[in-house]
Amino acid sequence: MEEMKRRRFLGSLAAATVAAVGTARLIVDPQPRTFAQVPLDAAPTSGPVAPSPVGLLPPPPLSARIPLPGGGALTTIPGDGDLLALTLDDGVNSDVVRAYTQLAKDTGARMTFFVNGIYNSWTDNLDLLRPLVESGQIQLGNHTWSHPDLTSLTQSKVEEELKRNDEFLKKTYGVGAKPYYRPPYGKHNGAVDAVANELGYTVPTLWSGSLSDSTLITEEYILKMIDEYFVPQAIVIGHLNHLPVTHVYPQLIDTIRDRNLRTVTLNDVFLRTP
């Protein structure tokens, strides 16, 4: 019976997603629609994490958090376990930001968004996204203000990119992103890391697997990447840029559930720094 209910839920999720975002395109609708029509002024949750309506495992307890590893970029979750960190970058397309946020709200999946504040999607979707940020279900990380190759910039420009985005996140969402920053294109070096460290961004956060959707690709290829990289202790990168990924949400959630993976934010895994 529970399996039938879950299948009905995912079926309605798929139908609503298609109805909302339509066929794949590279432009944003003048009035973006969510794929599940719910009030945007819902209060943030507090206390214990509510059970997932699709049977996803809850995040680990606070007592399970571990110290951040030192000595370089973070690419996987240390140790053995059942954790999956789905991390999503940029925010080019407001519809995709909205759809991923609604997916999290509807399923209980936990995610980390690495934000480029230059994109309007982060203010367009503020009312929907902020309660999930405040509850800790979605974490925000610093991906720089405008997505430059940091290794091509002067130290002052690197500082400007990180500080401007940091200030945007604090002003808009009331949260800081430290210590996690993701260098655009994964490109960083000692000089970049030194500037970031001075600002409190001590953890360059890369990945162990990718949905490869920074550019427009097919739904079939995204499903192939999900199958390959949704594995225990992985940090997977995806992008909030193009619509095909929004058409495969039911399969994405099914893979997480069927493999008994536990979606986590980075803050769910690691002890917070002072």
Kindly label every feature range from the protein language model:
Residues 22-40:
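C-terminal region of N-terminal signal peptides and the immediate post-cleavage residues
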Residues 49-142, 146-149, 157, 161, ...:
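Active-site beta->alpha N-cap acidic-glycine motif
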Residues 231-267:
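Catalytic grooves of carbohydrate-active enzymes
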Residues 187-229, 261-273:
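His/Asp/Glu-enriched short active-site or ligand-binding loop at hydrolase and phosphoryl-transfer sites
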Residues 105-112, 139, 155-187, 223-238:
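CE4/NodB-like, metal-dependent polysaccharide N-deacetylase domain
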Residues 91-95, 116-125, 149-153, 182-188, ...:
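Acidic-and-aromatic substrate-binding clefts and catalytic sites of carbohydrate-active enzymes
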Residues 1-17:
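N-terminal secretory signal peptides and thylakoid transit peptides that target proteins
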Residues 88-90, 115-117, 142-144, 183-185, ...:
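A cross-domain feature marking catalytic cores of carbohydrate-active enzymes
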